[in-house]
């Protein structure tokens, strides 16, 4: 009996020891699992760590910190190119200069497919998004009428559109322009014209203006600009501070407008003020002298008093400032290339349009302008690009389609 009792005790002890061993191993496994795969109590106040996304400004700051001074200045240049295709020479130019963008012109515009391919190839050869811009106002300035096979929608003059005083129609015309341009990959247009047609003998502006009433011009400009931008093309409001009251063509010589600050506020500046109030992103400064503002005959495009003091400080504009084309007679007949480049940047310009020599522009700006001033413009340019330049090309069927023609037919042509 005693032997049986002892045996029973031993067996029970062994069973208990085995059970304890199994429990110990399970507990150890559970602890290891907790360490490797923590379980978050959904009822607690603890939140999982958030993934912090890089802001556009942070991205731009990083890019600028990694750029050479030459690359920074390249971002301040928009190039006039004469190629029909992006050949090895042009690829090397883009690699060397790293320009901010190109202005599409009659030299680049051939067939629809070739022009589209040219623009695609420009973009593919640039690490930073390119501004692909064009003069496509309507009336006598619409470069896409040079397409050899499929014409863009023909837009009547802005003076004809202005006579309707129909801001909704102006918006729709902006949409038509935008959709045509997006079929090719264009993203910026040098329109609308904000000049008030106050001099009936002004042939250089003439019917490019919406009219002689500054408030009508303001309303039509802003509405057309909104039609452009709501449909993927960034508008450029031009030619600050106003090219409407002169008979001189700045393509050949320097216009001089003798108007006081008060006179400009009550006329020429009204459309630009309204554009600024409605978030204008680019304003083009014209090659026009206003001696009552500057006490000399310096063109507005080279004047700190007009660009920094008037446009930025007085009117509160903080968007991009671009020059009119730098190969125009108003400048090149009065200044050297070196003076043009340096004076424009000193005045407050961010982007130089069509410098005649990009390498020279980079050299003289590097030698005469502080890094801080260059960085100021480059940061604005890059923030603009990464915010607004979207690769949203439309199908070719949008070009000059039936709906576009129906909209344009509402503009009475005189």
Q: What would you call each of these model-derived segments?
A:
Residues 81-85, 134-147, 187-197, 237-243, ...:
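Short glycine-enriched loops at secondary-structure junctions
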Residues 156-186, 191-221, 225, 229:
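A substrate-binding/cap region within the structured catalytic cores of diverse enzymes
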Residues 2-97, 149, 313-314, 334-414:
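Preference for extracellular/luminal or secreted protein segments
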Residues 74-86, 158-171, 253-267, 327-335:
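Active-site mouth loops of central-metabolism enzymes
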Residues 91-105, 175-188:
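Catalytic domains of carbohydrate-active enzymes, especially glycoside hydrolases
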